[in-house]
Amino acid sequence: MYIPPSDPRRPAKVTAGQLCELCHARKALVKRPKNLQKVCKLCFFHVFETEIHNTIMENKLFQRGERVAVGASGGKDSTVLAYILKLLNERHDYGLEIVLLSIDEGIVGYRDDSLATVKRNQEQYGLPLKIVSYKDLYDWTMDEIVACAGMRNSCTYCGVFRRQALDRGAAMLDIHHVVTGHNADDMAETVLMNILRGDVARLEKSTAILTQSSGSPVKRSKPFKYAYQKEIVLYAHYKKLDYFSTECSYAPEAFRGTARELMKNLEAVRPSCIIDIIHSGEALRLRPRPKKRAPPPGSVEIRADGSASLFRNEGFVDGNRCERCGYLSSNRICKACMLLEGLEKNRARVQIADDTSTEGAARLTRTLEKLHF
């Protein structure tokens, strides 16, 4: 049937400049942030999935028959990761057994809603799910921690506790490989954060795609290391994936936000800056330090200022176990137990009146502001 040019039902003519730069057959719908390439929806799916597959194969992330836990939070990154890993596992026959592993930090109005998304993903993808909570592991929720120690320190606590919780959850499942949804933006932000803080020791390890602590049976990998956050969002949008998009209520206090803001400004000028920063981080290597001979136990070391120090053979190295909880630690007491000890001391000092009035809330706020942790 002929449709006259003036008829609104007539499809718009697609010019050569609007066609997909890969297939040259369909209209381009996506402009890739990574290289500004204009592609159609189907070609975008293909190149995005292929790039993730290439990252997995080039870095030899998985072994056939391996059981893998996806750190699932319900957010865009972990949701897309679970979807794509299941897809690629079936398409390329990786031979993996995939399990969803979620951590319940105990943040009312945030984590409870995101866990509802994870449970829907479990049904949608047909994957088993294991949920581990801070309350069960540490007898604290993040809301209780913030009430005791303040919002300024919230990400410090959560980072330490969450990392240990993932390892403990994997151990419960007898799984030795955890994959996380850290993307290229996250990796570049971590490099910037370590530079801004002058943390040279962590700078060298901040771009590793596969990590494993000495003595730990659990390794971690990041298949999205080179995937831009914007492309992950576009993939989730066009695939109509079910994910939770609300930011953690304590996230604005994190130092990472400073690095993220700097990254956005850089990306506006140079879109490739994210990958450039990652490659720069990969090229950084610490100069090897000359090894010192350790004096025998009980000997006296004379410092440069003339003072004396009695040498005691109490050094712990990576791969030792915490004396309290048995978790891997380079010290006698692991970081999590040290933080918990400080929280217990602070909790004893906080007196919360049984008052739901405005005056009671204000009094509690003033009490917490006086605490030093």
UniProtKB/Swiss-Prot annotation:
Single GO MF annotation: nucleotidyltransferase activity
Gene name tied to this protein: NCS6
GO CC annotations, alphabetized: cytosol; cytosolic tRNA wobble base thiouridylase complex; peroxisome
Family in the record: Belongs to the TtcA family. CTU1/NCS6/ATPBD3 subfamily.
Taxonomic lineage: Eukaryota, Fungi, Dikarya, Ascomycota, Saccharomycotina
GO biological process: protein urmylation; tRNA thio-modification; tRNA wobble position uridine thiolation; tRNA wobble uridine modification
Highest taxon of source: Eukaryota
Key word Chloroplast present: no
Swiss-Prot/TrEMBL keywords: Cytoplasm, RNA-binding, Transferase, tRNA processing, tRNA-binding
Pfam families: ATP_bind_3, zn-ribbon_14
Protein name: Cytoplasmic tRNA 2-thiolation protein 1
Organism name: Eremothecium gossypii (strain ATCC 10895 / CBS 109.51 / FGSC 9923 / NRRL Y-1056)
